Amino acid sequence: QNADTLVSCGGIQSNHCRAVAWAAARNGLSCMLALRGEKPVEVEGNLLLDRILGADVRFFSVEDFKNIQDIENTVVDELRRNGNRPYWIPMGGSNATGSLGYIQMIREAAAFPVSFDHLYVALGSGGTFAGVWLGCHHAGIQPRIHGIAVCDDRAYFVAEISRIQREFQEVYGMKVDFEGIGQAIDDRHVGVGYALNTPSELEQLVHFASCEGLVLDPVYTLKAFLGMVDHIRSGAVEKGQNLLFVHTGGHPGLFPKHSEFNKMFLFR
């Protein structure tokens, strides 16, 4: 691509944007990030890492983010006027190229000496789910895939995932079976909203970490995990079946929640 600057967008605590900033620094490239929301008073969590990694950060309103194309045009045009060669990565890395990493992940999982009956993954922008679906198709394994939405609804994700998979088919020439995507998406666990948690949800995060030594992040994996637990309790998962839970990281997202955790621990 002959680019010298990586450009992407997302929420202020975007794990994807932090990964883009890291990739840019690691490969000697510049980085510009367009983040959704007002400039915060404190620089913490993923935003702190963005800045430490040298990213040029710009803030756009929630209203602006309703048209991502305008944001892309704004930042890319500015960089080009300044003599840079930008490479735009869509929000969440959710496109055909971004799916490749999860296809590889599924290939590795398929080599485990155990087969999986169910696979659980968080749904934020659709790229991870699309890659997992494509990976299972490519690897010839057939677990029942569950995408637990952390924002938006089933109709939104069906459209986004189908778009990514069509793009993958066009770019890489691999035929994909789209049947059943809608039934695989569970949008009942968004809760009070994207990146927002109830005290009960955070209590369950703490309980699971203290019992298992595995820390979830409050935005994505916590809600996916709670969705999985709900399926187990409701009988949707049968006793003795094997489950694969995809942990997508995101631990820096815990730190902007420090005031909520403080309240929890102070009153224990």
Protein language model features and the residues they cover:
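Short glycine/serine/threonine-rich phosphate/pyrophosphate-binding segments
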Residues: 13-20, 26, 43, 124-132, ...
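Active-site-adjacent helical/loop segments in soluble small-molecule enzymes
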Residues: 181-239
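Small/polar-residue-rich loop-to-helix segments that shape phosphate-bearing ligand pockets
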Residues: 37-113, 181-204
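A short, small-residue-rich loop immediately preceding and capping a beta-strand
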Residues: 2-21, 27-36, 116-125, 148
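Glycine-rich phosphate/pyrophosphate-binding loop at beta-loop-alpha junctions
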Residues: 99-184, 246-268
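Active-site-proximal loop->helix
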Residues: 18-63, 155-167
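Alpha-helix C-terminal capping segments
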Residues: 1-2, 19-30, 133-140, 227-236
